[in-house]
A protein has these predicted regions:
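Membrane-proximal intracellular helices of multi-pass ion channels
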Residues: 1-322
Length: 322
């Protein structure tokens, strides 16, 4: 293909994917594999989501566990999690051929590059990754969400605010000895399930950013423990780092690939250092207003506002900068 035909193929494929994903979200109410009977998303949110996934933009304005059916997650989002990084890899190789082919015509075939990137790179890595994180407790099932009993009941006032010091006796809720009228006692919780592991693996490898759950890998079912956290972080850099060396090999000058990798690595270390120092020390405004605990027996301290409490500042900074 000439570069013009290659470009047209990329745009046509992406446009078709955008249309399919948009329609899946809007009409998911009428489609199968929707055990929760979730309504279709609004057209503007569907368009926003479709553009985000097709362009690999790392933007998510919805909660997948409550707003998307299993079909939309699998046939829509997971497919785009595969084909958008594959498209990026294909375009990279078209660029490499443009550098190296002096007399040859064309920059390769987009459909061949797309297929090879998906079958030989993304699918094997995703299969291995999905099996590993599923073994750590990430859901991978077609079963609908389950309702489970809480170990202890919790109470909320009429405005939906959690009553931290509430004493619960049946349906009666008291705080500091006074009965809270119209308080609601919650004894059950809905646990969202689905085939999360297969989507999370390629989400990390393809760096799309659209997770199965609304809070992505801060959700304990999407990222259960330190090992899954480490693995998912490594997935983020695996393919980008490898492509640096692929570039050097294909232009027949490995030093160029090493140079690109080292430039990326140094910028990463610089970014991690700046963010880590500032997040660990926090700011005087936060410390003065007691929003930051400098340290406790089980926590190294730092600005934990908006952070994943299970992993602390170190892992949070690493995830954010990677």
């Amino acid at each position: 293909m000439s570069w013009k035909k290659y470009l047209v193929s990329v745009l046509a494929f992406s446009g078709f994917g955008l249309l399919v994903l948009f329609l899946l979200q809007v009409f998911q109410k009428f489609l199968p594999f929707n055990p929760q009977h979730i309504e279709g998303m609004s057209w503007d949110l569907s368009l926003n989501t479709a553009i985000s996934f097709v362009t690999n933009t790392n933007w998510q304005a919805y909660s997948g566990e409550s707003q998307l059916s299993y079909l939309s997650q699998a046939l829509g989002l997971t497919v785009q999690n595969f084909v958008t990084p594959a498209t990026g890899i294909a375009v990279l190789y078209a660029l490499i051929r443009g550098f190296t082919r002096v007399k040859g015509k064309g920059v390769g075939n987009f459909w061949t590059d797309l297929t090879r990137s998906t079958l030989y790179v993304l699918m094997p890595l995703s299969l291995a990754g999905a099996l590993i994180i599923a073994s750590q407790g990430v859901p991978q099932t077609w079963k609908a969400a389950e309702t489970v009993e809480l170990m202890e009941p919790v109470a909320f006032d009429a405005d939906g605010n959690y009553l931290e010091d509430a004493r619960i006796n049946g349906d009666t809720v008291t705080v500091d000895g006074e009965v809270v009228e119209d308080a609601e006692v919650v004894t059950e919780e809905i646990v969202p399930l689905g085939f999360a592991a297969s989507q999370i693996a390629i989400k990390q490898l393809g760096t799309n950013g659209g997770g199965y759950y609304g809070v992505n890998s801060a959700h304990p079912l999407e990222n259960p423990n330190w090992f899954s956290n480490l693995l998912e972080m490594l997935f983020l850099l695996l393919i980008p780092a490898s492509l640096c060396f692929s570039f050097g090999r294909d232009v027949k000058d490995k030093k160029q690939g090493i140079a690109i990798f080292m430039a990326m690595f140094l910028m990463l270390i610089a970014a991690m250092s700046v963010v880590a120092v500032n997040e660990q020390s926090a700011s005087t405004v936060l410390t003065e207003n007691e929003y930051v605990d400098t340290s406790t027996d089980g926590q190294a301290g730092g600005n934990m506002e908006g952070k994943e409490a299970r992993f602390g500042i170190g892992s949070s900074v690493t995830w954010a900068t990677w």
